[in-house]
């Protein structure tokens, strides 16, 4: 284990944040530590407590010129069985292999530390930089995400805040730091479908209507449907059934209804309204007695090659020597809320191989490299 005195400023802050057990939506004073550091170098701080969620918005600079925002979350997912961890989940130690171990190391307290240290250095090196450096931080990303970034963005829009570029510190890298950045995400549309039949005795099927038998052909057709072709930036839209429930538990009772939960991860080639209409048409074709509750988690967004992606790519190349690969794969992130401001959004963070797992860990030295990548991006865009 590396002694604290030997740690870089980024690693010292990362360890401090990891040692705070901020399981969503608890912040455990992580944001207070970040704001203390940012305030010391001249950032204007605006805490935003919304319901049970801590958020903050911070800016440095002037209203003239573009805004580059660092966005992220201080909350982490639960540890799972603590006894399965090699080390205490919130101990934040660097092992003999040089790995920083602890819940949140990759997702995403390491990124938060790199953002803070890079910004401290930038505003000290360029006190009269153009535009503004901003932070949008929440403790509600791993949970429902109702009172976090989404709510803060709504407030920013209401007061006409400008947000040109945003780097979200999600762990985007796959094998090596910076090998992949996320320049967009698919939309997520969920549904809970109820198909109604008529309960009865299995020995008297003519007196019942089995919703399992009735729904099966429609569900099979939905699963086989080709929703779109995707495009140069997005794979084709996917449909997956995640839950299927029916029956009373008794073996001699035809159930009265069936509930199916499914999800679309959709590209920019499809719309919410279009997907909903096609689902309705298939269900009606099979003459089902049905109802459905839809839940939109986020629309797809895409940052095409331009100032932000170019600056991030050049910084990764300059620091690591490798070319990055833009990607829109994976799940949703808070970038979907920020993109509604017309903002160019890129996700760039550590290797994601162990996120949400027991023994979450990243290469400790990657965080100093990530700090330099963030710093170089600031220089390219705002110096």
Curated annotation (Swiss-Prot):
Record family assignment: Belongs to the peptidase M20A family. DapE subfamily.
Keyword Hydrolase on entry: yes
Function (record text): Catalyzes the hydrolysis of N-succinyl-L,L-diaminopimelic acid (SDAP), forming succinate and LL-2,6-diaminopimelate (DAP), an intermediate involved in the bacterial biosynthesis of lysine and meso-diaminopimelic acid, an essential component of bacterial cell walls.
Quaternary structure note: Homodimer.
Gene expressing this chain: dapE
Cofactors that this protein relies on: Zn(2+); Co(2+)
One of the protein's GO biological processes: diaminopimelate biosynthetic process
Biological or metabolic pathway of the protein: Amino-acid biosynthesis; L-lysine biosynthesis via DAP pathway; LL-2,6-diaminopimelate from (S)-tetrahydrodipicolinate (succinylase route): step 3/3
Note on cofactor: Binds 2 Zn(2+) or Co(2+) ions per subunit.
Record: residues binding Zn(2+) 2: 107, 142, 356
Keyword set, alphabetical order: Amino-acid biosynthesis, Cobalt, Diaminopimelate biosynthesis, Hydrolase, Lysine biosynthesis, Metal-binding, Zinc
Active site: 75, 141
Enzyme class: hydrolase
Catalysed conversion reaction: N-succinyl-(2S,6S)-2,6-diaminopimelate + H2O = (2S,6S)-2,6-diaminopimelate + succinate
A Gene Ontology molecular function term of the record: cobalt ion binding
Protein name (record): Succinyl-diaminopimelate desuccinylase
Keyword Amino-acid biosynthesis attributed: yes
Catalytic activity, EC: 3.5.1.18
Highest taxon, organism lineage: Bacteria
Annotated positions binding Zn(2+) 1: 73, 107, 170
